[in-house]
Structure formats: C-alpha cells, structure tokens
C-alpha cells in the first residue's frame, strides 16, 4: 500500500512537470532566421542563418559590429543562434576551393584587412559550439567597404553570367567570394 501511494505521488509529480514544460509559451527569436535558396549552374544551394541587427535588442543602441560585437581574430558563428548551415546538392567551389555535395556549418574568421570563410563538417550544434578539428576548408574572402550601412546581417548568393557570388553583408562591410559548380 505504501509503495502504491509513493508511486502515485511520483507519477503525479512527473505529469505536473511535463505539463508545465509543454505549457511554456514560445517566445519569438530576437534575430529572425532566413533561408536563402539559389541555383548556381546545376547546383541547388540552401543557406539557413539567423540575421542579427546592428542595434542591441535590449537597449536599442547601435553597436559597432566588426572589431566590436564580432571581434577580429575570433571565429564567429556568422549569424545568430544555431550555426549557419550551407547545403548543396552538387559539388561546388567557393573562392576556388572545392566543396563536395552535403551540408556544412559556416563560420567567419574576420580580420581588419579581410576574412576567412570556414566550412565545417559538424552540423546541428549551437553557433558557439565550434570545433576546429571539424574544419573542411578555410577560404579567403574579399572585403569591400559599403557606401551605406546595412542594419541587419545578410547572406546572399547572386548570379553572375555563368556562376555566382556569395556575399556576407553587415554594418559597413561586405565579404564575398566566387561560387561555381565544380567541374
């Protein structure tokens, strides 16, 4: 009898805890997420990333991004929340570096004079859980200063005559690299 009562108390506590977990309201993300779909040659490319703003979500104050919020010389998750994902259904090259078909996490290693795009084999992790041993390649990106600032981080794949250009834009800076189907 005593063990039945204990079992019922434990069962009731578990049910109550489970219902509290499911009843929690999901809050909207501070940084919206975006899926970029592009076709380069015959390759279908998808990039999923969080898009943080220049303004601090709590104070509303404008932040210095490059060399501030995103420090030079430190790996950045390239967006907000989970690691940014790149999926390609065909082998491609970015900045002349070959990448086989598959899904990868993208990171950025910014410096004052440029940046390196890091293509990492580990996926599904929170953006700050970077494991350098899983790096597939590091690709040099071109840096360009923009005439007008961009308030929200953006990733785009823009078509060119035959291939495309990967562009990462935020604040007053754009990083880019050619993207093509691997031949």
Regions found by a protein language model. Name each.
Residues 24-74, 123-183:
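Primarily secretory-pathway and cell-envelope proteins
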Residues 19-23:
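Sec/Tat signal peptide C-region and signal peptidase I cleavage site
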Residues 1-10:
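Bacterial N-terminal signal peptides that target proteins for export
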Residues 74-125, 129:
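Mid-length scaffold segments of soluble, non-membrane domains
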């Amino acid at each position: 009898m005593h063990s039945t009562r204990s079992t019922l108390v434990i069962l009731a506590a578990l049910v109550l805890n489970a219902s509290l977990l499911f009843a929690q309201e999901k809050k909207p993300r501070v940084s919206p997420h975006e899926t970029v779909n592009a076709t380069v040659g015959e390759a279908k490319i998808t990039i999923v990333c969080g898009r943080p703003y220049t303004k601090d979500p709590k104070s509303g104050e404008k932040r210095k991004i490059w060399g501030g919020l995103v420090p030079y010389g430190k790996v950045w998750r390239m967006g907000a929340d989970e690691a940014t994902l790149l999926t390609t259904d065909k082998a491609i090259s970015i900045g002349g570096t070959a990448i086989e078909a598959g899904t990868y996490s993208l990171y950025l290693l910014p410096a004052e004079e440029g940046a390196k795009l890091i293509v990492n084999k580990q996926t599904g992790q929170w953006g700050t859980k970077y494991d350098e041993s899983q790096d597939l390649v590091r690709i040099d990106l071109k840096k360009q200063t923009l005439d007008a600032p961009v308030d929200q981080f953006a990733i785009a794949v823009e078509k060119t005559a035959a291939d495309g250009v990967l562009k990462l834009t935020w604040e007053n800076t754009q990083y880019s690299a050619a993207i093509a189907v691997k031949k």
